[in-house]
């Protein structure tokens, strides 16, 4: 499948899905990718790639001169990300690694321009610390969080380690759903998008 648009936000229904594997929804994905500020040729790391929605869209943004690494601890997620990358024709500039962060990060002999951390890991402080070691100066990090504890832990870790220009945005999306008498707006869970830079 080809995505011929220059903006992120591939509709969720175009991705192959598995109910057991989380996915960054299209509106949140578009905002997270805009906070990453990806450029052609960038090297991007997606920690907790899940369905591969961020991995795929980041790959479209970096182009053939860039590379996107997707990491997940679940083999099913790695396989699903691979299938979605094949579906959108971007498998050629994606590297998929099965492993759990933060431990797996020290085995990657690369530096990254952009790092995305999805979901809510209990090890968020350790993941952020390990990310500091592999992100280039001027690189951006973006974290999606659902839990307030994740937000608190992420912000305190980012400040302590030295990330600058920290921002946090709370996003509440409601999608229209047809009912017998009209359209009702169904709210999704609030998501916090945290971003910062390595000086």
From Swiss-Prot:
It catalyses: Co-precorrin-6B + S-adenosyl-L-methionine = Co-precorrin-7 + S-adenosyl-L-homocysteine + CO2. GO terms for molecular function: cobalt-precorrin-6B C5-methyltransferase activity; protein methyltransferase activity. S-adenosyl-L-methionine binds at residues 24, 48-52, 72, 101. Pathway: Cofactor biosynthesis; adenosylcobalamin biosynthesis; cob(II)yrinate a,c-diamide from sirohydrochlorin (anaerobic route): step 8/10. InterPro entries: CbiT, Cbl_synth_MTase_CbiT, Cobalamin_biosynth_MTase, Methyltranfer_dom, SAM-dependent_MTases_sf. GO terms for biological process: anaerobic cobalamin biosynthetic process; methylation. Its EC number is 2.1.1.196. Keywords: Cobalamin biosynthesis, Methyltransferase, S-adenosyl-L-methionine, Transferase. The keyword S-adenosyl-L-methionine applies. It holds the Pfam family Methyltransf_31. NCBIfam families: CbiT, PRK00377.1. HAMAP family: CbiT (MF_00786). This is Probable cobalt-precorrin-6B C(15)-methyltransferase (decarboxylating). The gene is cbiT.
């Amino acid at each position: 499948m080809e995505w011929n648009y220059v903006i992120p936000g591939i509709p969720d229904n175009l991705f192959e899905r598995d109910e057991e594997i989380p996915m960054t929804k299209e509106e949140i994905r578009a905002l997270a990718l805009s906070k990453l500020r990806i450029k052609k040729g960038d090297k991007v790391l997606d920690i907790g790639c899940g369905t591969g929605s961020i991995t795929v869209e980041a790959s479209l943004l970096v182009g053939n001169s860039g590379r996107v690494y997707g990491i997940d601890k679940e083999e099913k997620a790695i396989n699903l990300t691979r299938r979605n990358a094949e579906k959108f024709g971007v498998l050629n500039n994606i590297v998929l690694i099965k492993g759990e962060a933060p431990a797996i990060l020290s085995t990657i002999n690369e530096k990254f321009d952009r790092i995305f951390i999805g979901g809510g890991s209990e090890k968020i402080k350790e993941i952020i610390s390990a990310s500091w070691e592999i992100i280039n100066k001027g690189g951006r990090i973006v974290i999606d969080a659902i839990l307030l504890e994740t937000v608190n832990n992420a912000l305190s870790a980012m400040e302590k380690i030295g990330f600058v220009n920290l921002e946090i945005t709370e996003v509440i999306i409601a999608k229209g759903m047809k009912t017998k008498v009209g359209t009702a707006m169904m709210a999704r869970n609030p998501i916090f998008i945290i971003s910062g830079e390595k000086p």
